[in-house]
Amino acid sequence: DGEQVVFDTNAEAQGHDFFRIGGMDISKDGRWMLYGTDTSGDERYDFRIRSLETGKELPEVFKGIGGACFTPDAQWVFYVKLDDAWRPYAVMRHRVGTPVTDDVEVYHEQDERFWVGIGLSFDERNLVIGTGSKTTTEVLLLSTDDPEGEFRAFIPREQDVEYDVSFSRFEGAGERGEDIPLAVVYHNALNPNFEIDVIDMRSHEPPYRLGEGVRVAVGSPYGCEYGDEVEPGASGMPIGTPYSNPCNPAILQGAHGLGIEGISIHRHYVALQYRAESLTHIAVMTKDAAAEDFLAGRPWKFTELVPHALEDDWDVDESVDEINEERAEVWGALDQLAAAQGEGSAVHGVSRKAMTSSDGATADAMPGETRRLYSIGVGGNPSYDAPRMRYSFSSYTRPGELHDIDPATGEDRLLKRATVLGGFEPREYMERRVWVTARDGERIPVSLVWRRDVPACDSAMFVTGYGAYEISSDPGF
């Protein structure tokens, strides 16, 4: 009755100077737990199988491995071996209840640049081996109905091409009411900022090819090293050049600096994650609408997810005069910084035209300024069948929040908000993003945060930033 504690780390750690969990998998029937522990700190894990009914463990122990997973029926364990350099390089198959000395190697990665992983697909219909280097990836599949079969490449490896694949289906959308099995491929073979293709797997058995299927979303090639392969002259254009593509949903048309970051297709909804104007975005639509667009061969009709709480703040809390006053403070601070750093600074030459030409009649964001300034991301949605989607968001002045939303109705519920001690009040702080032009002509986003009652032009400024390896300094509390 009620909740059951399946693993108490504090109790398990008794008698060990070091103790760390290295992964956990619960069988689909809830009877068995596969878990790994490291008691020496060397990041090699010993995995064991424990009965959740009796608490007893099976005799087999998988020593010094990198990770492991059950098949859905918990009759088999697949796990990853490590070499002397701690590289995951091989996948082993184990029948539960037999000696580990009888285990069989089912995959061996010979190229030392590549690391190997094993897991189940989201729909639990396939075992998935993922192998990848810094610039190249490959996915191999094996049906969970045939665990003793041979893994096959879903798409053969191509040097300097990264791809990932997930699986879903359009329930009852076939001509005879059958399900349409889908492979959702995320790759950069044809576009440096990635694209998403959805393949109807009824067409043929794997292997497939990169670019096959229906293109759902395509990133911008502008300012990218290989952009000219997509569009002549694209690599020499500024990253923020507006990008349009007939395959893209309407909400992506004309986006600045568009990068595609992923998609998830659940039973009731589809969620697209992308980046534009250097900020993260989520777009959602119902599964039924996605199936209709897919079968009709037209762009999918996504709607951007905007947290209702933020919409309320923008629309109600600030008058036009207040917003224009804030703008004057922001640009005054930038003028001060530019004067201090001289003509060669990145902030020198920022245009004030939008502010000085404004007649104060509207509260719209001026060119070069971003009113939307927060991070948003999909997370915590492990169930394929759940009708609601969880997402999180945060900004420089708003503690992190966890919400769930019904994509069909738009009903948004706050589940949790981070607590800040000391009487913190978000409305006492302001945040804005402006764009400054660097010496090479590229536009750079600058986020500004300050207390409303602190004079922006006469106060000290703390400056920090980072930008490399496609790692962004996203807004966060």
Description of each model-found segment:
Residues 1, 26-41, 78-85, 95, ...:
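Beta-strand C-termini and the immediately following turn/loop, strongest in propeller blades
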Residues 12-18, 37-46, 61-63, 70, ...:
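A flexible loop/linker signature enriched in serine peptidases of the S9 family
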Residues 175-178, 226-242, 318-352, 356-477:
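Serine-hydrolase catalytic core recognition
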Residues 52-55, 95-99, 143-147, 201-204, ...:
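Short loop/turn segments that connect beta-strands within beta-propeller blades
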Residues 13-36, 62-80, 111-130, 153, ...:
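Conserved beta-propeller blade repeats
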Residues 2-56:
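Well-ordered mid-protein domain cores that form the structural environment of catalytic cofactors
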Residues 2-10, 58-62, 102-107, 150-155, ...:
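Beta-propeller fold detector
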